[in-house]
């Protein structure tokens, strides 16, 4: 069995809100769902679903949903009733733009707010989270990590093509914070996420943690 599982889908996710279907959904997870299995209700809550275009558009959303599974609500919200002793996130404004917000327009979008950190620390001390501390089964075929960063193998245009079927509007340091793609319907540029880690952001530079830095010799060359 697993502690948490995240499923990535290339399908366009949607949900019902106030009786209307909205497609403005990129991920879903249960708050405090890690390790939770209710055999009486045949329900498993330790799951998350994330939409990904195939060009790493779901990476940040995956981290956001894992935050939910580890007990963090959206910044600005109160804790759910079943986590009544959790500090919640009422004192951390949504507009600050940390990981548990979708207002992620600065480098803070890859960091947890103080509220998120406190909530996850609280959850990890509960008995619910006990499965996260057991010794995992060893595998005779462990998965090997990639030798290059994700963006090193995908140009900025390719990332926008996967997301919106158009090209990137900019090819400079701005893409590390927000990847702007051309939006045919309005004739303007639109961004929903940063370029993938390792994406080229200038001559001899690439994106790392939402910053445009000189490319390290430890990483492969990226594409523009």
Spans of features found by a protein language model:
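Extracellular (secreted or membrane-anchored) zinc-dependent metallopeptidases
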Residues: 1-224
């Amino acid at each position: 069995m697993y502690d948490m599982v995240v499923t990535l889908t290339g399908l366009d996710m949607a949900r019902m809100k106030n009786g209307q279907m909205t497609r403005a959904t990129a991920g879903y997870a249960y708050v405090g769902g890690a390790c939770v299995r209710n055999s009486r209700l045949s329900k498993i809550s330790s799951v998350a679903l994330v939409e990904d275009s195939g060009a790493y558009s779901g990476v940040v959303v995956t981290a956001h949903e894992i935050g939910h599974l580890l007990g963090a609500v959206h910044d600005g919200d109160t804790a759910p009733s079943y986590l009544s002793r959790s500090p919640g996130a009422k004192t951390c404004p949504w507009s600050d733009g940390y990981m548990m917000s979708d207002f992620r327009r600065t480098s803070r979008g890859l960091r947890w707010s103080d509220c998120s950190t406190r909530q996850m620390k609280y959850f990890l001390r509960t008995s619910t989270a006990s499965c996260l501390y057991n010794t995992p089964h060893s595998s005779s075929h462990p998965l090997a990590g990639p030798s290059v960063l994700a963006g090193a193998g995908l140009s900025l245009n390719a990332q926008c093509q996967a997301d919106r079927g158009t090209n990137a509007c900019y090819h400079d340091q701005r893409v590390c914070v927000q990847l702007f793609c051309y939006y045919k319907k309005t004739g303007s540029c639109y961004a929903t996420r940063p370029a993938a880690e390792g994406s080229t952001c200038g001559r001899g530079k690439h994106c790392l943690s939402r910053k445009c830095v000189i490319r390290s010799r430890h990483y492969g060359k990226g594409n523009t």
